[in-house]
A protein has these predicted regions:
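Feature captures the catalytic cores and cofactor-binding loops of soluble hydro-lyases/lyases
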Residues: 21-125
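Acidic, glycine-rich flexible loop/linker segments
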Residues: 99-163
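Short hydrophobic "helix-edge" motifs at membrane interfaces and signal-peptide entry regions
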Residues: 3, 55, 143-145
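Alpha-helical scaffold segments in soluble metabolic enzymes
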Residues: 19, 33, 37, 95, ...
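N-terminal, positively charged, Ser/Thr/Ala/Gly-biased leader segments
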Residues: 1-23, 156-163
Length: 163
């Protein structure tokens, strides 16, 4: 498994980028500082309590709304290593990959994951393991080049390393 977390952060459908990081904070240039406001408009407990390595799980169309790399950036800055969702808004999906935050879509199976479940992820196989329920969910496998971009820490690092 690439990632394993005993605690997850569970969110519903249509969580938009304006909720992930409200526009009123976008003047803050440092992503670690900006991350202190992550999810503030939907979950005031997230930013002060999330621990590095804890996984985020969401419903349909996660990251819809404005095209801003700040949204996946603040989630990554808080130490979330991967986001699992029913589906992602396409621009959020690409922005997440471009900054080195892996995302995996598992469709309706996401409804089997409850807030208290321990979760594991094997990115290369596109599998999410529900360690609490002893179940596994086949997600969309990411093409190898996308896995390589995420592993490099994002598109910029990937391009630098290809020299």
């Amino acid at each position: 498994m690439d990632f394993e977390s005993k605690k997850i952060w569970r969110y519903g459908d249509d969580v938009d980028t304006d909720v992930i990081i409200p526009a009123r904070y976008l003047a803050i240039a440092d992503w670690n500082e900006l991350a202190e406001y992550a999810m503030e408009d939907i979950d005031t407990t997230f930013a002060p309590n999330v621990k590095a390595g804890e996984i985020m799980v969401a419903g349909k169309n996660f990251g819809c709304g404005s095209s801003r790399e700040h949204a996946p950036g603040v989630i990554k800055a808080k130490g979330v290593p991967v986001i699992i969702a029913h589906s992602f808004a396409r621009i959020f999906f690409r922005n997440a990959i471009n900054i080195g935050l892996p995302v995996i879509e598992i469709g309706e199976q996401v409804d089997r994951i409850d807030a208290g479940d321990a979760i594991g992820v094997d990115l290369s196989k596109g599998i999410v393991y529900n360690l609490t329920k002893n179940e596994q969910y086949q997600g969309t496998e990411l093409p190898q080049f996308i896995q390589d971009i995420a592993a490099a820490g994002g598109l910029v690092n990937f391009a630098k390393n290809r020299k």
